[in-house]
Amino acid sequence: MVSMIHIVVFLLAITTMFEILPLITVPVTKYLSLSSFRNHYYGLFGWCVRGQNQELMCTKMKIGYDSTDVDSSGHVLTLPSNSKVVVSNLLVVHPISLAFTGTLLILAVIIMVTPLGDSPEMLLFTALFSLPTFMLCLLCFLVDILLFISKLDWPGWLMLAATISVALCCSMLWVMRRVVSVKKYESQQSIAHACSMEQYSISDIYQSKQNGNSSEYEVAPTHTDSLIAPEVTYRGFIE
């Protein structure tokens, strides 16, 4: 059980790092991008174009793209897929997914370092919370694929690894919850069985044994005793 929760915490920590990287793509930094296409570099909060002097010219930072957006040099947005620009508004699921994953990591750490790890209720809540976390990670990856198709860069592909990692954590949390519930049920059953047994003191057992031994030597009288017993007749003289 201890090793399993350690694995969950480790995987969630790695997943959190994977989900942070898309948030620091262009134009936040100029070294990472979700996708690159024809000198266009796309990030979570905008997009950039590399000019003739190899300098990136970016749009203002905001979630989602706009067909009227232009960079500082007047370039117009061009997506690598045929998706409508309005789909880019779904990129908002990235920070939401990061918040859920971070919360799930905190819950896993609490389970690992506190006695709440033996609580079926706490494990049930954490396992249930992992379900929307997994769905949000999966939605992030699907949105990235829908927008950028085969032009997805490695920070975007990390969302696939994050989705698989959260799926493994979700499965292990449900297994942990099942194991703890079974152990608690078996403990309650053993306590109930012990309480239902009659308890005798040593003196009571000894007294009962003595009564049993003495009764073995007692012979109950029968109706034949009167036939076997001799009759004594007094014969005398009457003066």
From Swiss-Prot:
Q: Where in the cell is it found?
A: Cell membrane
What's this chain's function? Required for the proteolytic cleavage of the transcriptional repressor RIM101 in response to alkaline ambient pH, which is necessary for sporulation and invasive growth.
User: Which of UniProt's keywords are assigned here?
Assistant: Cell membrane, Membrane, Transmembrane, Transmembrane helix
**Coiled-coil features, chain-numbered ranges:** none
Top-level lineage group: Eukaryota
Q: What does the similarity note say? A: Belongs to the palI/RIM9 family.
Q: What is this protein called?
A: pH-response regulator protein palI/RIM9
Q: Which pairs are disulfide-linked? A: none
What gene is this protein a product of? RIM9
Q: Which residues lie on this side of the membrane: Cytoplasmic?
A: 1-3, 112-128, 177-239
Entry's InterPro entries?
pH-response_reg_palI/RIM9, SUR7/Rim9-like_fungi
Primary place of residence?
membrane
Bilayer topology term: Multi-pass membrane protein
Give the transmembrane ranges: 4-24, 91-111, 129-149, 156-176
The biological process GO terms on file are: ascospore formation
Give any Gene Ontology cellular component: cell division site
Q: Name one Pfam family in it.
A: SUR7
On the Extracellular side, which residues? 25-90, 150-155
Which organism is this protein's natural source? Saccharomyces cerevisiae (strain ATCC 204508 / S288c) (Baker's yeast)
Keyword check for Transmembrane, yes or no: yes
